[in-house]
Amino acid sequence: MIKIYDTMTRSLRKFVPLTENTVNMYVCGPTVYNYIHIGNARSAVAFDTIRRYFEYTGYQVNYISNFTDVDDKIIKAATQAGVSPKELSDRFIAAFIEDTKALGVKPATQNPRVMDYIAEIISFVESLIEKDFAYEADGDVYFRVEKSEHYAKLANKTLSELEVGASGRTDAETALKENPLDFALWKSAKAGEVSWDSPWGFGRPGWHIECSVMATEILGDTIDIHGGGADLEFPHHTNEIAQSEAKTGKTFANYWMHNGFVTVDNEKMSKSLGNFVTVHDMLQTVDGQVLRFFLATQQYRKPINFTEKAIHDAEINLKYLKNTLQQPLTETADEQELKQFVIAFQDAMDDDFNTANGITVVFDMAKWINSGSYTEPVKSAFEKMLAVFGIVFEEEVLEVDIEALIAKRQEARANRDFATADAIRDQLAAQGIKLLDTKDGVRWLRD
């Protein structure tokens, strides 16, 4: 039985899906104006692991993660680069996909983009105005926070506490607002900005409305799980709840999940502090699986400190697991012992996806395997556990198989069947085996 720590209730709750055997998840994706750093990647990896565990236990998962391709930061970066916002966002969407693929993140069921939902966003805003939850002011449209009952329920604070703690993350206070916490649903266009026509003039969506529209358009008025980084709890997720529930009159999400930060010297990794390393740069020297494994060593809600030693340890531990998988199979293994490992792994992951405890079970099982208990069922169970963490090792070609293929190639060459000989060379090359034809015969090496 899976239990989830729900930010809304500040408690562990048994997971009960809206539809049996199906999980509908929406996870806030990146604002695509630059390469993602390790801290950004944690959210992608954490929720991918959660998705994978749901699938491990038999659920079908509809996993939606958006790309914010309309934003002040994108407009600014595009202007500086001398390209259009779409060109810039396309470039960094491609980079995000490449980086997360290297981290073993599965493709989302859908990756909606804001630019594709402008008509739906305008319709959503019109509905809020009709219900008196929003008001137009000189081409801008704001959400009326004081009309929203229990506005701060996710943050578990009063309105006055939120005002003090917003730290510049709410819209800049203007004379047009009825309340400093009122937030923009639609922003009037400035000269030269990307914009769309609307009932309030040319403009573009506010940040928060985008996720509400894409989530409800794809998954419906109520979804099972909404996730994102802990920094999104307020104002982003707070505002998503307010506007979504104002429009539909229904609970927006049944479970709210937030991942912790990656820290450097115990301080949050962020672009503003300048203490970040991009995934793109890290992948030049560190294997993506190593980064992934490092991010899995702590339970998703806890902070994780980024150090060279932590990355080195992750690399060493991955090599150990890979070597374990390559052990020769044995004829027997204690079936009850195997069952206990599987139960222990599920107990760990059922407890709010506790990857740290899950990994402990994996290493205990590896020690057992290396003591001489490695049948085909054991190997299958072990590989499935590793796959939950996105760790999948490609099967290495055995030396005996390489030698057999080389002999077959030599025979083909002797028979002047060069097409077959070349095909075998290509087959081995695709598996990382390079052939060297010398006067003393054929030598081979792993590329």
Swiss-Prot record:
* Localisation: Cytoplasm
Q: What class of enzyme is it?
A: ligase
What SMART domains does the annotation carry? DALR_2 (SM00840)
Its UniProt entry gives the catalysed reaction(s) as:
tRNA(Cys) + L-cysteine + ATP = L-cysteinyl-tRNA(Cys) + AMP + diphosphate
Q: Where is this motif: 'KMSKS' region?
A: 268-272
Top-level lineage group = Bacteria
- Where ATP binds, per the record, is at K271
Protein keywords: Aminoacyl-tRNA synthetase, ATP-binding, Cytoplasm, Ligase, Metal-binding, Nucleotide-binding, Protein biosynthesis, Zinc
What's the record's note on cofactor binding? Binds 1 zinc ion per subunit.
Q: Which GO terms describe its molecular function?
A: ATP binding; cysteine-tRNA ligase activity; zinc ion binding
InterPro entries referenced in this protein's UniProt entry, alphabetically: Cys-tRNA-ligase (IPR015803), Cys-tRNA-synt_Ia_DALR (IPR015273), Cys-tRNA/MSH_ligase (IPR024909), CysS_C (IPR056411), Rossmann-like_a/b/a_fold (IPR014729), tRNA-synt_1_cat_dom (IPR032678), tRNAsynth_Ia_anticodon-bd (IPR009080)
Q: What is its EC number?
A: 6.1.1.16
Cofactor dependency: Zn(2+)
Q: Which GO terms describe its biological process?
A: cysteinyl-tRNA aminoacylation
Please give the family membership noted in the entry. Belongs to the class-I aminoacyl-tRNA synthetase family.
Q: What is the name of the protein in this document?
A: Cysteine--tRNA ligase
Biological source species: Streptococcus pyogenes serotype M6 (strain ATCC BAA-946 / MGAS10394)
* Gene it is expressed from: cysS
